[in-house]
Swiss-Prot record:
GO cellular component terms given for this protein: cytosolic large ribosomal subunit
This protein's name: Large ribosomal subunit protein uL29
Pfam family, one: Ribosomal_L29
Family: Belongs to the universal ribosomal protein uL29 family.
GO molecular-function terms, A-Z: structural constituent of ribosome
Keywords assigned: Ribonucleoprotein, Ribosomal protein
Native source organism of the sequence: Magnetococcus marinus (strain ATCC BAA-1437 / JCM 17883 / MC-1)
Phylogenetic lineage: Bacteria, Pseudomonadati, Pseudomonadota, Alphaproteobacteria, Magnetococcales
Biological processes, Gene Ontology terms: translation
Gene that this polypeptide is encoded by: rpmC
Length: 67
């Protein structure tokens, strides 16, 4: 199952919780990157994309409810 389909099955509350956790992780990754302690720099991109995916799924649900 793809990440997008897994996210689409989650509730809005679960998506919000996951997004908050990802924002915290992104903050920590940026801090580690700035202090040259980050080994896996590709994780920054992965986290950014997961946040974008969650925002997209939430937006799709809001648009669907308005119709």
């Amino acid at each position: 199952m793809s990440v997008a389909s897994e996210m689409r099955e989650m509730s809005v509350e679960a998506l919000d919780d996951k997004m908050k956790a990802l924002y915290q992780e992104a903050f920590n990754l940026r801090f580690q990157h700035a202090t040259a302690q980050l080994e896996n720099t590709s994780r920054i991109r992965q986290v950014r994309r997961e946040i974008a995916l969650i925002k997209t799924v939430i937006g799709e649900r809001k648009a669907k409810e308005e119709v």
